[in-house]
Amino acid sequence: MENRWQVMIVWQVDRMKIRTWNSLVKHHMYISKRAAGWFYRHHYESRHPRVSSEVHIPLEEDSKLVIITYWGLHTGERDWHLGQGVSIEWRQKRYRTQVDPGLADQLIHLHYFDCFSDSAIRKAILGQRVSPRCNYQAGHNKVGSLQYLALTALITPKKIKPPLPSVRKLVEDRWNNPQKTRGHRGSHTMNGH
């Protein structure tokens, strides 16, 4: 019998970002309790040798978001692609599909964090409690409504420290956009080129 390959999207990530992500998840699971219901699986609890951690985020009664971090992958064409990666899956019973980081953040925002949204005016008219600020800015992928922009101009959003874990921040690629850093003038190694 021949080998059958299964292809999946794995975002190449710096290992320090993975450590930061895991620390933020654990902090908000155990200390701040903002990520109540999330489940963290260590590398020694997985049967797959390349899995370094898994974070299971329940969404509805039988669906969840699973963020899996890998180590020991083949390195990429650049020096900093050191064999670390992240995959993001949406699972419901036996069905699995991969999602992009923006959609993952939106799903987390939708199920876990209250926000002033388009329906806030209707809620206020009905006498329901309306939150004047958003606790999870990473869940927004576009400019908010005029009402939201007016409210944010009136009430400054409160910064949460440490920040809530964002999947988009975890997989963002800052390496391919050269950033100028302070250093000697004309130094090609310091200015990102």
UniProtKB/Swiss-Prot annotation:
Subcellular location field: Host cytoplasm; Host cell membrane; Virion
Post-translational modifications: Processed in virion by the viral protease. Highly phosphorylated on serine and threonine residues.
Sequence motif: HCCH motif, positions: 109-140
Molecular function per GO: metal ion binding; RNA binding
Record region (Disordered): 173-193
Spans annotated as Interaction with host APOBEC3G: 40-44
Sequence motif BC-box-like motif, residues: 145-154
InterPro entries: Vif
UniProt site (Cleavage in virion (by viral protease)): 151-152
Chain positions covered by the region annotation SOCS box-like: 152-181
Keyword entries, A-Z: AIDS, Host cell membrane, Host cytoplasm, Host membrane, Host-virus interaction, Membrane, Metal-binding, Phosphoprotein, RNA-binding, Ubl conjugation, Ubl conjugation pathway, Virion, Zinc
Keyword Membrane: yes
Region (Membrane association) location: 172-173
Highest taxon of source: Viruses
Misc remark: Vif-defective viruses show catastrophic failure in reverse transcription due to APOBEC-induced mutations that initiate a DNA base repair pathway and compromise the structural integrity of the ssDNA. In the absence of Vif, the virion is morphologically abnormal. HIV-1 lineages are divided in three main groups, M (for Major), O (for Outlier), and N (for New, or Non-M, Non-O). The vast majority of strains found worldwide belong to the group M. Group O seems to be endemic to and largely confined to Cameroon and neighboring countries in West Central Africa, where these viruses represent a small minority of HIV-1 strains. The group N is represented by a limited number of isolates from Cameroonian persons. The group M is further subdivided in 9 clades or subtypes (A to D, F to H, J and K).
Assembly with partners or alone: Homomultimer; in vitro and presumably in vivo. Interacts with viral RNA and Pr55Gag precursor; these interactions mediate Vif incorporation into the virion. Interacts with the viral reverse transcriptase. Forms cullin-5-RING E3 ubiquitin-protein ligase complex (ECS complex) by interacting with host CUL5, RBX2, elongin BC complex (ELOB and ELOC) and CBFB/CBF-beta. Within the ECS complex, Vif interacts directly with host CUL5, ELOC and APOBEC (APOBEC3F and APOBEC3G) substrates.
Chain's role: Counteracts the innate antiviral activity of host APOBEC3F and APOBEC3G by promoting their ubiquitination and degradation. Acts as a substrate recognition component of an E3 ubiquitin-protein ligase complex: mechanistically, Vif hijacks a host cullin-5-RING E3 ubiquitin-protein ligase complex (ECS complex) and the transcription coactivator CBFB/CBF-beta to form an active E3 ubiquitin-protein ligase complex that targets APOBEC3G and APOBEC3F for polyubiquitination, leading to their degradation by the proteasome.
Family stated for the protein in its record: Belongs to the primate lentivirus group Vif protein family.
Name the record gives this protein: Virion infectivity factor
Gene expressing this chain: vif
